Amino acid sequence: AERHPDELMEIDVKYVPGTVAGMKYFQYTAIDTASRWRRLAVYDEQTNFHSILFLKEVMEKFKYKIQAIKTDNGSIFTNYYTSMTKRSDMTVKTIHALDLFCKENNIIHYLIDPGKPAQNGTVERSHREDQEKFYEQNTFKSFSDLQIKLERWNIYYNNLEHCGLNGKTPNEFLLNYKLIKPTNVCA
């Protein structure tokens, strides 16, 4: 079956290797599984607040309705397995701030099975690309330097031809669906 760009967005967090000016940072990644279009952001913390902040930014940049997201079971995305108020009946999910945000915005929040990162394979593969082609090739003088270089890397990635897209770039794929305006294609 043909995939459509608004169907599923995989979201994950990657530790930025090493330190930048003595600080640790976290890269949030959202990738559309149909178009491979990505949005990246770096924060100094990984928290529920940052997860929602990042999803809001993704929703703003994509300019189309995200139907569903898929995340791992980290406490920044769910408290299904970690909540202090966990019920003995695991069919009843405890409410997490991200789940509430998704519900308010009519977004389905899927969770991968515990210990099965391959179920979030599109975002995991993109993190490998980030490691090999971005982090191992760059150094960062400051948080601002990291942000600028990461934004450039994101623009490059979204304009890179992908075999899985029959040689199209993620931006070209989305333009064919007329889901984003050309002025928003670069980021």
Ranges and model annotations:
Residues 1-9, 75-76, 82-100, 175-180:
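Basic, flexible linker segments flanking DNA-binding modules
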Residues 44-48:
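A short acidic/small-residue loop/turn micro-motif
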Residues 6-7, 90, 105-107, 116, ...:
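C-terminal domain-tail junction helix/linker
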Residues 64-90, 113-115, 120, 168-170:
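Acidic/histidine-rich, metal-coordinating catalytic segments
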Residues 122-125:
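Histidine/acidic-residue-rich catalytic or RNA/ligand-binding cores of hydrolases
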Residues 1-31, 37, 49-53, 61-62, ...:
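Mobile-element integrase/transposase regions
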Residues 12, 30, 36, 55, ...:
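Mobile genetic element proteins and their domesticated derivatives, centered on retroelements
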